[in-house]
A protein has these predicted regions:
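Surface beta-strand/loop "capping" patches
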Residues: 342-381, 400-410, 414-415
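Short beta-strand element of the alpha/beta-hydrolase
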Residues: 82, 93-103
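Conserved alpha/beta-hydrolase "acid-adjacent" motif
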Residues: 301-307, 332
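Cap/lid segment of the alpha/beta-hydrolase catalytic domain
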Residues: 102-107, 118, 126-180, 234-247
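Short beta-strand/loop motif that positions the catalytic acidic residue
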Residues: 288, 294-296
Length: 473
C-alpha cells in the first residue's frame, strides 16, 4: 500500500561536513537508542481519572517515564507526565496516534482530553493520546538560582554535553525516552480497559522541540509506523543555520535562548558534530524510512521557509511536505490539523498518499508533475521589498493565493513576476480529496527569487572548553 519514494529537486551543498574527525565520533551513533531502551526502574503509571463521553471514554494517567540525571545535577530527577487518552467505544485499528506535547509540571491535572483529540479519535475509530510535559519543566540545575524552561533548558544541557561529552546530558535524550514510556504504557493499559484490544504500532506527532522528538523516537523505536513532525524545519542544522544568518544578518530573536547560552559559537565544532550524532534527526535518516509528513510554517519565527532544501531531498522512503501559508510557528488560525487528520486516516486505512515530484526550473518557475490529479493547484506567494525575511512578524499574513491551471494533465508550472525591489517567496499547494471529507493539502518546497543571500556568514571561534578540543590542545 505504500507509495513510491516521493522526490523533489536536489540541492547541492546540503550535507553536514564529514571526514576523519567526524568518523571518530561514531561511538555516539548508538547512544540515543541505548539511552532510550535502557530499562529504568522509575517507570510506572497510575490511572487518575476516567471520563465517559458520547461514543468515547477519556483516561487521565500519571506517567513517570524515567530518572533524568542525578540530584547532584538537577533539583528533580523523576520525570512525571500527564498521559491523556481518548478511547472510542468501537476501536477499529491497532494503530494509535501519540501527540507529544509540552506544559509545566506546575500545571494541575487535566480535566480531560482536548476537543481536537476527541474528534480525531471518534472520526478515525482509533486511540489518541497526548503526552504532556515533554520536557519536564521547570528544572533548576546545580549551581543555578533560576529554573529553566523550554529552549533555555535544552540549550543549557547542550552546553553541558559540549563540555563533558556525557550523553546523559542532552535533554532530547530524556524527551525521546518519555515517548517510549508513553507507548509502553498505552500497550499495557488499552487491553485492560478494552476487552483485550491491543495496540501494535503508533503514528507520532508533535510541534517544535516536540517535533524534533517525533523524529528521534521514530529513529530508535520500530513501533512507530509513521510520523508527522510539525514546525521543526531545521534538519541538517549547520548549513541550515548558516543560511539563516546569510538571509537575515542576525539570529532571529526566537532563538535567543541558544544565543544567550553561546550555543551558536559551537556551530561546526567537533563537539557539535558529536551532539548531532546523538540527537540530530538528519544523522539518523537511514533509520527514518517510514512514511513521514513534514508540516512547516511559511512565517515561522525560528526557521526560514527555504530550510527544507538542506534535508528533504536526502530523506529516505515515503515523504511529503506542507508549508502552511500565513502561519507563525504555532500554526494557529490555520487548517494544519485537517492535513494531519487526513494523513493519519490514510495511514490507518492503508490508502496510498498522493505522489508528485517538483523541480526548480532555470526560468525561475516551479514545475510540478502529479501522478494523481489534485482537486486544485494553487500558487501562494509573498513579497518583502526590503529584506529576505518572510516571518509573519516582518511581513504580516501577506501571502496571497492564485489558482494555477495544468499545462497538461497532472502537470503544473508556477511562474511569478519578480518584484521591483526585494525578494518574492512562492510555493505550489496541491489539494486532494479524502474519504473523510477533510482535504489533504501538500506543497512543494518554497522558492525565493532572486536567489541571493545579502549577508556573509563568518564562522565563529569555537570555545576552548569543548570535551574534544580541550584534549587536543
Amino acid at each position: 500500500m505504500l507509495l513510491l519514494a516521493f522526490t523533489s529537486v536536489t540541492f547541492a551543498g546540503s550535507e553536514t561536513p564529514t571526514g576523519a574527525a567526524d568518523q571518530s565520533l561514531s561511538r555516539f551513533e548508538t547512544a540515543l537508542a541505548e539511552y532510550v531502551h535502557k530499562k529504568d526502574p522509575a517507570y510506572r503509571y497510575d490511572l487518575r481519572q476516567t471520563i465517559s463521553g458520547n461514543g468515547f471514554t477519556e483516561y487521565v494517567i500519571e506517567l513517570v517515564s524515567q530518572n533524568f540525571l542525578t540530584l547532584a545535577d538537577v533539583d528533580r530527577t523523576e520525570w512525571h507526565h500527564w498521559l491523556v487518552v481518548v478511547k472510542p467505544d468501537v476501536i477499529r485499528h491497532k494503530t494509535a496516534l501519540v501527540y507529544v506535547g509540552g506544559g509545566s509540571n506546575r500545571d494541575d491535572s487535566p480535566r480531560g482530553a482536548r476537543d481536537e483529540f476527541v474528534s480525531i479519535a471518534v472520526t478515525t475509530g482509533s486511540v489518541v493520546a497526548e503526552l504532556r510535559m515533554v520536557p519536564n519543566q521547570p528544572l533548576r540545575f546545580a549551581g543555578e538560582n533560576e529554573r529553566r524552561f523550554e529552549d533555555s533548558l535544552i540549550a543549557y544541557t547542550w552546553d553541558k554535553f559540549y563540555r563533558t561529552g556525557d550523553v546523559r546530558w542532552p535533554a532530547r535524550m530524556a524527551m525521546t525516552k518519555s515517548v517510549k514510556a508513553a507507548m509502553d504504557a498505552l500497550q499495557e493499559f488499552i487491553p485492560v480497559v478494552s476487552s483485550g484490544h491491543t495496540l501494535a504500532d503508533f503514528v507520532v506527532t508533535g510541534a517544535s522541540k516536540r517535533g524534533w522528538t517525533t523524529w528521534t523516537i521514530a529513529a530508535v523505536d520500530q513501533r512507530v509506523r509513521a510520523i508527522i513532525p510539525l514546525v521543526i524545519d531545521m534538519l541538517n542544522l549547520v548549513p541550515s543555520f548558516k543560511h539563516h544568518w546569510r538571509a537575515y544578518g542576525f539570529w532571529a530573536p526566537a532563538i535567543d535562548d541558544y544565543v544567550d547560552q553561546n550555543i551558536m559559537a559551537w556551530m561546526g565544532s567537533p563537539e557539535e558534530l558529536a551532539l548531532h550524532k546523538v540527537v540530530e534527526p538528519y544523522t539518523h535518516r537511514q533509520h527514518l524510512t517510514l512514511p513521514k509528513l513534514i508540516i512547516n510554517a511559511t512565517g515561522d519565527e525560528f526557521f526560514l521557509p527555504t530550510s527544507s532544501q538542506f534535508y528533504f531531498d536526502k530523506l529516505l522512503g515515503e515523504k511529503h511536505l506542507r508549508y502552511v501559508p500565513n502561519s507563525r510557528h504555532n500554526l494557529s488560525r490555520t487548517d494544519a490539523l485537517q492535513t494531519l487528520l487526513a494523513y493519519y486516516h490514510s495511514v490507518l486505512s492503508d490508502r496510498p498518499r498522493p505522489r508528485f515530484e517538483w523541480s526548480f526550473e532555470a526560468d525561475g518557475s516551479i514545475l510540478v508533475e502529479c501522478h494523481e490529479t489534485p482537486v486544485v493547484a494553487t500558487i501562494w506567494s509573498a513579497v518583502n521589498p526590503t529584506n529576505r525575511d518572510f516571518r509573519v512578524d516582518s511581513i504580516g499574513r501577506s501571502w496571497t493565493a492564485e489558482v494555477v491551471e495544468p499545462v497538461t494533465e497532472g502537470v503544473y508550472r508556477a511562474h511569478v513576476t519578480l518584484p521591483e525591489k526585494g525578494w518574492k517567496a512562492f510555493l505550489v499547494e496541491l489539494t486532494y480529496s479524502t474519504p473523510i471529507d477533510v482535504p489533504m493539502k501538500l506543497t512543494t518546497a518554497v522558492r525565493v527569487l532572486p536567489n541571493t543571500l545579502p549577508h556573509d556568514y563568518i564562522a565563529p571561534k569555537w570555545p576552548d572548553e569543548g570535551f574534544i578540543r580541550s584534549k587536543q590542545q
